């Protein structure tokens, strides 16, 4: 890429890169050429992605602003922040080595994407589900090797999330594939499901019995990382102290408004909220009321 090249080719290249490395996100964007795959969250791969994203930042910097519209210039800055935020997550926040829930979310979302959206015949989607289930033991083994000293709350939430994935595989997937009449494929799915569930159960037991008792990690990001996420992901450069002051001011103003409205209703905030609860439609009429 050279200075002055239009922005569009870079955007296309960047999207292709994201789709190749994040097949689940690709599926939710309607790109299904990677649907047979699960993400590879191994240390080697993710550290390599950090370097590759750094190269993309440099490529984008070489796209000259001259000839760009104002909108394109803004988009260029947004793209830069987006890529830098991904690098920041990989290299600074490093949730991929701290949070076992991340791996369960990859698997759950990837499987759900094939169930929820009938973009292809059920047989085709079932074969892609089969492929993902066969890759599940590898994903779980990667989690076992990669996660280091996770905070206790991350362990508890990870176990809960992984148990939810097991429930999905054992109960929701069969219901979603009731129209599938390929007995050979159904048999393969049953076998792959059993192997996937066995791997997940083994990992949750490992987390519960070996990792949790020794967990000393902190869930806190720290001020520097918190400010970095705000700037790169939200475009907010005010800093934590300033944001806290704004939040406290807004809280006080909101509380005062609550008290004022409650007073006009002839009571305190608690009694006003109780009156609102009594005016709530029943479960049977909730949808029709909203309509």
Where are these regions (language model features)?
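N-terminal maturation segment of proteins
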Residues: 1-291
């Amino acid at each position: 890429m050279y200075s002055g090249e239009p922005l569009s080719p870079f955007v296309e290249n960047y999207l292709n890169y994201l789709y190749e490395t994040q097949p689940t996100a690709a599926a939710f964007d309607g790109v299904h050429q990677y649907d047979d795959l699960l993400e590879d969250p191994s240390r080697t791969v993710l550290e390599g992605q950090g370097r590759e994203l750094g190269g993309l930042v440099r490529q984008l910097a070489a796209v000259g602003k001259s000839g760009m519209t104002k909108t394109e210039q803004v988009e260029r800055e947004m793209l830069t922040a987006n890529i830098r935020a991904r690098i920041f997550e990989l290299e600074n926040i490093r949730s991929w080595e701290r949070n076992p829930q991340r791996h369960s979310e990859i698997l759950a979302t990837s499987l759900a994407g094939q169930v929820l959206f009938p973009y292809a015949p059920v047989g085709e989607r079932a074969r892609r589900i089969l492929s993902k289930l066969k890759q599940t033991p590898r994903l779980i083994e990667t989690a076992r090797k990669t996660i280091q000293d996770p905070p206790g709350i991350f362990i508890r939430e990870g176990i809960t999330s992984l148990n939810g994935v097991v429930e999905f595989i054992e109960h929701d997937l069969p219901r979603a594939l009731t129209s599938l009449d390929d007995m050979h494929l159904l048999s393969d799915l049953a076998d792959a499901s059993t192997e996937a569930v066995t791997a997940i159960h083994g990992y949750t037991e490992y987390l519960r019995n070996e990792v949790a008792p020794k967990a000393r990690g902190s869930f806190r990001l720290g001020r520097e990382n918190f400010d970095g996420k705000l700037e790169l992901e939200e475009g907010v450069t005010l800093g934590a102290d300033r944001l806290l002051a704004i939040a406290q001011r807004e809280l006080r103003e909101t509380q005062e408004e609550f008290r004022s409205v409650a007073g006009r209703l002839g009571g305190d905030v608690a009694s006003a909220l109780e009156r609102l609860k009594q005016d709530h439609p029943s479960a049977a009429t909730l949808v029709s009321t909203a309509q």
